[in-house]
Amino acid sequence: MRKTISLISVVLGAALLVFAIALPTYVVPKGKVMPLDVVSTSSTEPVEARLLDSGALAAGKPVGDKKNRPECKGDDKEVSCFIWNDIEIQTQRFITAQEPSDKKQVTLEGGQTVFRTDKSEPDNLLSATIDRVTLDRKTQMPVTDPVSTLNLVPPKGKDAEGYTPPEFVRKGLQYQFPMGADRKSYPYFDAQTLTTNPIDFVDEGEQGGEKIYTFEQTLDPTSLYEAQKKYLESDGSLTAAEEGVLDSLKLTFPAKVWGLKDDEIRNPKEGEDKDEESEAGPDVEMERYYTVNRKISIEPETGVIVNGAEEIWMFYAQDEEEAKEIAKPENRERELANPKRTAMYLPAQWDEKSKEGQMVTAKEGLSTIKTMGTTVPIIAGLLGLFLLFVGLWLQRTPRKS
């Protein structure tokens, strides 16, 4: 009996030591996969923004007290007359895991809305998108199949019924960073331009008592019309719903309405007969350009995003050269102080509730990693050593007669 107990103790002790070593070095890394029950909500603080009021523009009614300005009287009111300088805007994003999801991949669906706080639903809605991306649960990177979609079509209207957005291959991160993230650059997907660009590590800090990494990215002015048209046309011709999406991204008005002087006109619309030009000047076509500076903070062990800020600016320009000129710091400051081309300027920052909620999710993941990677191996190792000692002691101790 003594020999049997000794043998069992040695075998169990050795097994526990192997388990204690294997758990943090092999089992835990293999177990770092995204969960299948992802649910997260984030919203930004209500913030003073600039906004071109499309309804006021269509009706020809200047916003606020701008109706008293000279350029806002008569038939050819300038675009600046319809831009709010101090409207309050907020954003919300809701992310959930959807099918198809299995042991190797998880599909995330993100719904994002941008809305005014001075109006009630549904009149407050400025934009709404539904984004779907399938991630490799082990690497947290998008799969290489063309299964991502981005629905840019407004949810209202008959053209939206039954609409299916084009599928494409996504290459960058967006809702989740890799578990065990490093202090380096990562490819990041921008949902406005549908492009992937590096987002760079810039700082290490602390939030909620945990270490965080902060990454930053700035995108130069990019034509949203060209970027979104390229995506929407990728599966063939444009539908009526998709043409509606593009309508607001390219506008044509007489030069006077844009506030242009003769020497500022770069591309008068082709086919314009100077003899038939009105006092407002030739028609000038402009596209909406987009630039953004974003900062994202993550808990590096879990890859969970715990804070975010995006300074978004959309404005109209005649071409890329003019867009870059407008975006220069001195011109940018002048434009935002007295907007004439701005479609939207939104310095969005996550609110405290969102930051706290995401940090709770990160801490839950950290707790699991710590338990499996530290606590359990220590207990298993100590118990294994104890059993080995007992087994060897029983073997070496002489049996009494």
Map each language-model feature to its residues:
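Solvent-exposed N-terminal domain segments of exported/luminal and surface proteins
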Residues: 2-157
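Juxtamembrane interface at the cytosolic side of transmembrane helices
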Residues: 2-11, 365-401
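Helix N-terminus capping/helix-initiation residues
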Residues: 35, 53, 136, 178, ...
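N-terminal short leaders/motifs
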Residues: 144-163, 222, 236-244
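Short N-terminal edge-element motif at the start of the domain
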Residues: 161-193
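Membrane-proximal low-complexity regions enriched in glycine and acidic/polar residues
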Residues: 184-315
